A protein has these predicted regions:
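Short loop/turn motifs that connect adjacent beta-strands in outer-membrane beta-barrel proteins
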Residues: 27, 40-46, 92-101, 145-155, ...
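Residues that define the transmembrane beta-barrel architecture of outer-membrane proteins
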Residues: 46-48, 78-84, 130-136, 155, ...
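Transmembrane beta-strands of outer-membrane beta-barrel pores
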Residues: 54-60, 107-113, 142-144, 163-171, ...
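Predominantly the C-terminal beta-signal and adjacent terminal strand-loop region
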Residues: 196-255
Length: 255
């Protein structure tokens, strides 16, 4: 009988210890979950993406001429000019396990100037001639942000496809240039496409990222590198070819 009472006491103690350990583990898990909820990133609604864009630009003006003629190169040379621009995208649709898709519009500007050539020669004249270009586009934009959202890999590949439209004007010191009664200004349109890779910068300072979201609503910031192709020539309709193929870099912000 005494032995039975001892065994019963030991069994009761073991049962109580088991319940205590389970309660302690559950409390620790709840505490850990609460801590994680308290420190997790809280993001505001994300609807827009805005890009600042920079890169080299050399229009394909000479591509429309045959027989080796290259009027653009003869006046402005082979060097590329720098363009700057902006893009605004509406992230209208979120595709699960892929990213965002929606329409975007972009605008950019570049200009070049040089001494005009004396007629029929390669000799510079005293007259300055210049050309400015204003390419624009509307495109569908797909940003594949599943890597940073689900796997904590801060890389976002993306693609763009749409239509481009550009204004241009050639002028000299007297105003808009004119030849054969045709004023040196006009417009061109065509296809626009781009692919790129963006690096999400949140990992550099998570606290600053949260503060930026809280204060002005910027969810994420990116640096990016993009290859852009713009065929602005009227689909072969005789417009001046002011498009180009070039790389683009800059900063992007999701808002």
């Amino acid at each position: 009988m005494r032995r039975s009472r001892v065994l019963g006491a030991i069994a009761g103690a073991l049962t109580l210890l088991t319940f205590s350990l389970e309660a302690s583990a559950q409390g620790s898990a709840d505490s850990d979950a609460s801590w994680r909820r308290g420190t997790a990133r809280r993001e505001s609604d994300q609807t827009w993406a805005f890009e600042l864009r920079f890169g080299p630009y050399r229009p394909n003006v000479d591509d429309e001429f045959e027989g080796g003629a290259a009027p653009y190169r003869e006046v402005f040379g082979d060097s590329k000019r720098v363009f700057f621009g902006m893009e605004l995208d509406w992230q209208a649709l979120r595709i699960p396990w892929v990213g965002t898709f929606g329409p975007g519009v972009g605008w950019s500007y570049t200009s070049m100037s040089s001494k005009a050539k004396l007629s029929g020669t390669n000799v510079d004249s005293a007259e300055e001639t210049s050309l400015w270009l204003m390419p624009m586009y509307a495109a569908g934009v797909l940003r594949v942000d599943v890597l940073p959202r689900e796997l904590s890999i801060p890389l976002v590949p993306y693609g763009k496809l749409g239509l481009g439209y550009g204004l241009w004007k050639a002028s000299n010191e007297l105003g808009a240039s004119e030849q054969g009664g045709v004023t040196g200004k006009g417009h061109s349109y065509g296809l626009h496409a781009a692919v790129g890779l963006a690096l999400q910068l949140d990992f550099l300072d998570a606290a600053a990222t949260q503060q930026l979201d809280n204060s002005v609503g910027i969810n994420h910031a990116y640096g990016y590198l993009e290859w852009m192709w713009s065929d602005l020539g009227g689909f072969g309709g005789g417009q001046m070819k002011i498009g180009t193929s070039t790389w683009v870099t800059g900063l992007a912000f999701e808002i």
